[in-house]
């Protein structure tokens, strides 16, 4: 089956469906790749505890070193970005940030497999994540500081006549931060996928014209390979950016700044 449209790769395709307690459930390519991302992340964590990783070894193998590097990178991120409050330790949120990071990371990496599905290209998914994080951070702030959390919407030293306007601006900005968190991730993944798909299709068509264009076509293939390597780096960067901005939301709720 050939993909005739660059946007066709983002379509949801149901594999099968079933009824449970009078509710209909569908298992689609989105659910498959999202579940596969979670399964790979869990499997790598378990493997890292075995002799093939860093478990039971004073000097871990390359796989263990790579896993430890990612682990301590995220641990340092949480320690630097989420400052402990009087009642809550910032490190207590590390499991959540780590799980969020590896899920997005492997979701981004699986899309680089030919004909793979990009779960993070679904804006409903990325926006759902970001809005859930925003709501959770807001509830955390209310739990820790009660009504004082609304001080986030009122900068100190604001003249009384400007209070309604600035509160509205800060509130809209607060909501926009949550929306932009998901839109940024989804837009970058969509743009990268479309670039590789369109460029790959043009090269394939060009090389199929005749023998001369077939030989010349190997030159733009190097550009496509370079873009693929760039997308590999973007997969890590976008997961890291999502994690660091999530840390910012949590820190603002804990410390009101």
Curated annotation (Swiss-Prot):
Keywords: ATP synthesis, CF(0), Hydrogen ion transport, Ion transport, Membrane, Mitochondrion, Mitochondrion inner membrane, Transmembrane, Transmembrane helix, Transport. It is found in: Mitochondrion inner membrane. The chain crosses the membrane at residues 27-47, 58-78, 93-113, 122-142, 149-169, 189-209, 214-234, 236-256. Pfam families: ATP-synt_A (PF00119). GO terms for molecular function: proton transmembrane transporter activity; structural molecule activity. Its main location: mitochondrion. GO terms for cellular component: matrix side of mitochondrial inner membrane; proton-transporting ATP synthase complex. InterPro entries: ATP_synth_F0_asu (IPR000568), ATP_synth_F0_asu_AS (IPR023011), ATP_synth_F0_asu_bact/mt (IPR045083), F0_ATP_A_sf (IPR035908). The keyword Cell division does not apply. The keyword Chaperone does not apply. Residues 1-4 form a propeptide. GO terms for biological process: proton motive force-driven ATP synthesis; proton motive force-driven mitochondrial ATP synthesis. It is a multi-pass membrane protein. Mitochondrial membrane ATP synthase (F(1)F(0) ATP synthase or Complex V) produces ATP from ADP in the presence of a proton gradient across the membrane which is generated by electron transport complexes of the respiratory chain. F-type ATPases consist of two structural domains, F(1) - containing the extramembraneous catalytic core and F(0) - containing the membrane proton channel, linked together by a central stalk and a peripheral stalk. During catalysis, ATP synthesis in the catalytic domain of F(1) is coupled via a rotary mechanism of the central stalk subunits to proton translocation. F-type ATPases have 2 components, CF(1) - the catalytic core - and CF(0) - the membrane proton channel. CF(1) has five subunits: alpha(3), beta(3), gamma(1), delta(1), epsilon(1). CF(0) has three main subunits: a, b and c. Belongs to the ATPase A chain family. PANTHER family: ATP SYNTHASE SUBUNIT A (PTHR11410:SF0). HAMAP family: ATP_synth_a_bact. NCBIfam families: ATP_synt_6_or_A. This is ATP synthase subunit a.
């Amino acid at each position: 089956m050939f993909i005739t449209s660059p946007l066709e790769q983002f379509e949801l395709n149901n594999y099968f469906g079933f009824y449970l307690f009078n509710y209909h459930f569908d298992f689609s390519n989105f659910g498959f790749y999202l579940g596969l991302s979670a399964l790979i992340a869990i499997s790598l964590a378990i493997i890292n505890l075995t002799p093939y990783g860093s478990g039971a070894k004073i000097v871990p193998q390359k796989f263990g070193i790579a896993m430890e590097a990612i682990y301590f990178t995220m641990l340092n991120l949480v320690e630097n970005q989420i400052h402990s409050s009087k009642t809550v330790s910032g490190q207590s949120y590390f499991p959540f940030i780590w799980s969020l990071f590896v899920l997005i990371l492997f979701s981004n990496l699986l899309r680089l497999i030919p004909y793979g599905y990009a779960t993070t290209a679904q804006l409903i998914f990325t926006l759902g994540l970001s809005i859930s994080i925003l709501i959770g951070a807001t509830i955390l702030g209310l739990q820790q500081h009660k009504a004082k959390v609304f001080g986030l919407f009122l900068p100190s030293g604001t003249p009384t006549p400007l209070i309604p306007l600035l509160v509205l601006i800060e509130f809209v900005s607060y909501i926009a931060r949550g929306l932009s968190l998901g839109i940024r991730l989804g837009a970058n993944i969509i743009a990268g996928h479309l670039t590789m798909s369109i460029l790959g299709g043009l090269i394939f068509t060009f090389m199929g014209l005749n023998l001369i264009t077939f030989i010349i076509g190997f030159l733009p293939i190097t550009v496509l390979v370079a873009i693929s390597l760039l997308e590999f780096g973007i997969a890590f960067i976008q997961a890291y950016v999502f994690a660091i901005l999530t840390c910012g939301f949590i820190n603002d709720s804990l410390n009101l700044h």
